[in-house]
A protein has these predicted regions:
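Non-heme di-metal
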Residues: 2-195
Length: 195
């Protein structure tokens, strides 16, 4: 049997010839392409594309390389800041009785986080040398980071408590517990998948 893929919606048909009509998007047989060999993706996201296409590219001037790197990194930092600020604004809106506004801020924050993730993915190890292209390496690294973040936040909470700053103490102490939970969850995943 021959495989035929609809170039409009991706439906795969097996038969001697393409179907007269795609059962999903209803285009004609002319929109089907015979699959030769293995299926391949026309495009996909790639980790560290900056290093692969810009960093050592002799056709790009040093000035443009610096500009591209600086802008990618600045955009990453900006997107991360927006995530925190938008979630803060969502909390304010909810407290003021504007739940729809709060929910939109939360949606926008998630989109900004997606943007930050894409900038991080493009920059790869040029953004953070410990970040790698493999799940195992990233789990190992982040387990250590979460345990460190737990200790750092706990120390800040203790200092706030010593100075009778209850609002700061309570919030940061709860965050320390969140970091501990993250660390334990990531450690469990590391052990489950990578022994």
């Amino acid at each position: 049997m021959t495989k035929w893929v609809c170039t409009v919606c991706g439906y795969v048909y097996e038969g001697d010839a393409a179907p007269a009509e795609c059962p999903v998007c209803h285009v004609g047989a002319d929109k089907f392409k015979k699959v030769e060999g293995d299926l391949t993706l026309a495009a996909e996201h790639e980790y560290g594309v900056y290093a692969k296409t810009v960093k050592n590219n002799p056709e790009i001037s040093d000035e443009d390389k610096k500009y591209i790197f600086d802008q990618l990194k600045a955009n990453f930092v900006g997107e991360c800041s927006e995530v925190g600020m938008y979630l803060c604004m969502a909390r304010i809106a909810h407290r003021e009785g504007y739940p729809e506004v709060g929910l939109y801020w939360e949606k926008a924050a998630y989109e900004e986080a997606e943007h930050a993730a894409k900038f991080a993915e493009m920059l790869g190890e040029d953004l953070e040398p410990n970040m790698k292209a493999t799940t195992k390496d990233n789990l190992k690294w982040r387990v250590d980071c979460e345990f460190g973040a737990t200790a750092g936040k706990f120390d800040l909470a203790k200092c706030a408590k010593k100075n009778n700053l209850d609002a700061i103490h309570d919030t940061v102490h709860e965050m320390a517990r969140d970091e501990a939970r993250h660390g334990k969850a990531l450690q469990g995943l590391l052990e489950r998948y990578f022994g």
